[in-house]
Regions:
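A short linear-motif detector with a strong N-terminal bias
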Residues: 60-64, 106-107
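A short acidic/glycine-rich loop-to-helix N-cap element
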Residues: 2-8
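N- or domain-start disorder-to-order transition segments that initiate the globular core
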Residues: 27-62
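Active-site-proximal helix-loop-helix substrate-binding element of RNase H-like nuclease domains
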Residues: 2, 13, 17, 23-41, ...
Length: 221
């Protein structure tokens, strides 16, 4: 700590308040640390079908949707979505997009879901691309309503501290490093790709919960 360095002092005070807040909420701290232990995912066809059925039957449910794509440009015909993961923080399913494209597009247009994304702009563009390529009405798409990158930036605008790996380490104490090379994602083994995709959705869901809880605590105080 250096009180003469104004910027460092701001960082120290912010992190000190965070630490003291956690000390006063040991039960929540333990819950945070246990999040990584609760991660699991399914690629089972029966479980995926059942997952979709439950989402359509349960309204006002919050879920995270995460895409793995061959590139960033949703408007390029050379790039595409390869796989999709969906997580409600308890159960996570992941699949190759071509296996469930019709059901998934129906889900994107389902208005009773609160959809979380790492970056809503990115996921929105690819969602519209999927709907358009399937010959469906893009106007029926219901946009993502939660964006964790925007929330994390509002909480901490420093450069380099808002990527998913850092956020997972900071908030949950988990060293989360993807096991795939994103520059060669189209050639990755399917098993490794699906696990990576599932982790993204699961941790994004819980980061969003963390940010929402933080906002609620600030309103109370």
């Amino acid at each position: 700590r250096n009180p003469d360095d104004i910027e460092l002092e701001k960082i120290f005070l912010r992190d000190f308040r965070l630490a003291m807040n956690l000390i006063g909420q040991r039960d929540k701290l333990e819950a945070r640390l246990n999040i990584g232990k609760s991660f699991s995912y399914s690629t089972n066809r029966f479980e995926i079908q059942n997952y979709f059925n439950n989402l359509f039957n349960r309204r006002e449910k919050r879920i995270c949707i995460d895409y793995e794509t061959t590139g960033l440009n949703a408007y390029s015909n050379e790039e595409k979505v390869i796989s999709v993961a969906i997580s409600d923080g308890v159960s996570t399913v992941v699949f190759m997009i071509e296996d469930y494209i019709d059901l998934f597009i129906e889900l994107l247009c389902f208005s009773y879901l609160d959809k979380i994304a790492q970056s809503a702009g990115f996921e929105d563009k690819w969602s519209r691309r999927l709907i358009k390529d399937a010959g469906k009405d893009v106007g029926s798409f219901v946009p993502f309503s939660q964006d964790i990158l925007i929330k994390s930036f509002l909480l901490n605008g420093r450069v380099g501290v808002n990527n998913l790996e850092f956020l997972v380490w900071r908030y949950f104490g988990i060293e989360f490093k993807g096991e795939v090379d994103r520059t060669k994602i189209a050639r990755e083994a399917e098993g490794a790709l699906l696990k990576y995709n599932a982790q993204d959705a699961f941790y994004t869901y819980w980061l969003n919960e963390e940010f929402l809880n933080f906002a609620e605590r600030q309103l109370v105080h």
